[in-house]
Amino acid sequence: MKNNDSDNFNFDSFSNLDWYKSVNSNLLDLADLNSSNKIIDLGCGNGGITEMILSKVKDVSSIVIFAVDSSSSAISLALKRFSNRKDVIINYIQSEAQNLHENIKEKVDTVIYCNSIHYVEEKEKVLQHIGNGLERGGKFAFNTSFFDGSHPKETEAFLRKWMLKSLRLLRSEYNLKPVKNKVQSRIQLSPENYEELLLK
């Protein structure tokens, strides 16, 4: 949307939902973080996932976390959340996912990317950069609740109408308009599409 400053936007309320925490906790369990020394929390938001990472690692003093988000307000929330933690190194980086390789030059053991890959326009390029930034045997764990097939077919008409109504409201009450070059990032891939991208 025009006039939408992503620097000042965050998903604080959403990231505190119980189901969101549960799904991401399971993803972190699958990633088995205890063999990781350097971890990127991509799309770190308010630090909720970073906090989960810390709770799952046995020796937090042996790790470095790169907490990355495009939103300065989200980074501020994360900074506040961990302001009293002196037992772990957390490097906060404001960056879009597609610029990750420009902002973190060293290789890492694990990249965690919870529920935000669907916002990325050039998914293939981002996944290549993530792969190139991993140590040999490194891990990339991600999820998304927005993929082709995530909504029952019978709800698609409702979702389209809801989106159109939302756009009209934003236009009429706030003079906001869609940014044309952001539309591509909302095209939802299927799980098979993601698998193909990961195997390239």
Features from the language model and the residues they span:
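Short alpha-helix
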Residues: R186-L199
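A short acidic, Gly/Pro-enriched loop at the edge of an enzyme's catalytic core
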Residues: E102-V111
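A short glycine-rich, Lys/Arg-flanked "PGG" loop and its adjoining helix->strand segment in the class I
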Residues: E124-R136
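Class I SAM-dependent methyltransferase SAM/SAH-binding core
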Residues: I40, N46-N99
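A short SAM/SAH-binding and catalytic strip from SAM-dependent methyltransferases
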Residues: T110-E122, F146
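Short glycine-centered segments of the SAM/dcSAM-binding site in methyltransferase folds
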Residues: K38, G138-K139
